[in-house]
A protein has these predicted regions:
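Secondary-structure capping and boundary motifs in well-ordered enzyme cores
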Residues: 16-23, 53, 82, 183
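Catalytic and substrate-binding regions of extracellular carbohydrate-active enzymes
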Residues: 73-212
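Extended ligand-binding clefts on enzyme/binding-domain cores
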Residues: 36, 40-91
């Protein structure tokens, strides 16, 4: 609700900001229907398919921006949308708002989020049962808060299931497993130099110079 509230208060349409205009496509390419995700950071390993929060957000974006990627993702996950309680009141108010639920025919197999340093690739975005998906991260943002020391790391899934994924589990920010494994580079599909991983700091940044 925040962008709508701020739009009302400030008399500026926050939904026209590039972040909201591109969030639907980013969400669809990161988390295909009925599939694990190829994203990064705390908790990326937990769900087997997009959750109600993600689908509720996709529905919101589709209604407010007309994004076909967000509309397609929301339509493919109707049960999760039904279970979403956070945006339920919004959907009641916006009940008559319709949106496109068809994945664009010209949907690329590859998308590069240059501002955050992530690349997402799909062999068949529209068909999870045939899709091979790869996510790669080398970001100008280092390790801090909900990010981990996984520069130059990748996630690989096939038919919605993990092939190569980061390991471990998140309990709390300061437990031994979180600090020495889950957040450490050794838990991710990246490179250690003489057994040494990347630093736990926002200065431990990376970069993707080109992608094709």
């Amino acid at each position: 609700y925040m962008p709508m509230l701020l739009s009302y208060i400030c008399k500026v349409d926050f939904m026209k900001h590039p972040w909201y205009q591109n969030a639907g496509k980013a969400l669809a390419y990161t988390w295909q229907p009925e599939s694990k995700n190829i994203g990064f950071g705390d908790g990326n390993e937990k769900l087997e398919s997009p959750g109600r929060v993600q689908i509720g957000f996709a529905d919101f974006l589709a209604r407010e921006t007309g994004d076909p990627y967000a509309g397609w993702l929301a339509a493919q996950s109707s049960k999760a949308l039904h279970d979403d309680i956070l945006m339920r009141l919004y959907r009641i108010v916006r009940d008559k708002t319709t949106y496109n639920t068809t994945l664009p025919e010209n949907a690329p197999k590859f998308t590069w989020h240059q501002d955050i340093g992530e690349v997402m690739m799909h062999s068949d975005l529209g068909n999870t049962k045939k899709n091979l998906a790869l996510g790669f991260r080398s970001s100008i943002f280092g390790s801090g808060s909900h990010t981990v020391s996984n520069q130059n790391a990748f996630q690989l899934i096939y038919k919605g299931a993990d092939v190569y994924r980061s390991t471990g589990y998140y309990l709390n920010f300061e437990d031994a497993h979180n600090l020495m494994s889950y957040r450490h580079s050794r838990a991710h599909n990246t490179i250690l130099v003489n057994g040494i991983g990347q630093p736990f700091t926002t200065k431990g940044y990376g970069n993707i110079n080109c992608a094709m």
